Amino acid sequence: MPIVLITGGSGFLGTYLTERFLADGHTVRILDVLPPEKVSTGVEFIQGDVRDSEIVAKASAGVNVIVHNAALVPLSKSGDAFRDVNVRGTSVMLKAAIDAKINKFIFVSSSSVYGVPNNSDPITEETAQNPFEAYGISKAEAETLCQNAKDALDVSIIRPRTILGPGRMGLMSLLFDWVETNHRIYILGNGNNRYQLVAAEDVAEAVSLASRLPCRGQDFNVGADRFGTLREDLEQFCRAVGNKSKIVGVPSWLARATLPILGLLRLSPLVSYQYRIADKTVYFSTEKLKTILSFTPKYSNSEMLTRAYRWYKDHPTDPNSASLHRKKMNAGILRLLKYVP
């Protein structure tokens, strides 16, 4: 039975990747600093850091496929540590994969490598990268390492938009709290921008296909195939869950003037990438995904929001969870918005 190693397999996306590869008939080996919430049949867990070459070599032994998904995420606000984990960790993983003669190496990157779009055109794999914050820069550098290794290793890159699905909390917990109480929903700008999301299941499917189909040296942008403007998607979501919240736009200039200061004072959980693109049209073309992997993402933006919200209602989250994507966000001063009439 083929073995796939998934780094960061205990986190939000890692859980979906594990389920996908188990369904494909693989044995799954997870390498993570944290144990998974549950260990299913067919799953082996190794606790360790992707920067530890000895542990990485042990985890890579006998593996057919490596999915390198481990990373420090933006909500951690980890500064210089982004490069240490996301770049150096990728370098260690690539070396281990080459030494172990792995059949396939897939790197899970991020849409943040493109920075803030300067127009409303769809982002393609040929669009120039222009990251501006530590997380996006670290992901772009890690991508370069992967591309440089493609002569020695069958490597592909999966680049998701903002990932959503049942089990995802983080920033979404603030939105869902407003919806649950029929409170106003605050957005940056007027909401007429197209803002694409992607379902965790669709990302996992793209990774699975890239592990099986010939796509050496290829990168794939992955995002929803069906979505409208931010306002349209939120309105459709609210109707689906029987919510009567009013969507209220906050002037973008005001948010961009105040949020950096609040961030420095540790009063806001938002990072610069989030509030600099929130009112922009940001979406991937999925043509390459459809052409080479013959895959069309299944879920629309509003369907993702609806499914994630219903999960939120049915599953109280663990406030002590170490995964920043799987526990409610500390809203900081933003929690006061709930009391604005």
Where are these regions (language model features)?
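N-terminal Rossmann NAD(P)H-binding glycine-rich loop of SDR-like oxidoreductase domains
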Residues: 4-24
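Glycine-rich NAD(P)-binding loop of the Rossmann-fold in SDR/ketoreductase-type enzymes
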Residues: 51, 81-92, 129, 133, ...
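Conserved beta-loop-beta element that borders a ligand/cofactor-binding pocket
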Residues: 143-166
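Mid/C-terminal beta-alpha module of Rossmann-like enzyme folds, strongest
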Residues: 210-270, 286, 302-309, 319-326, ...
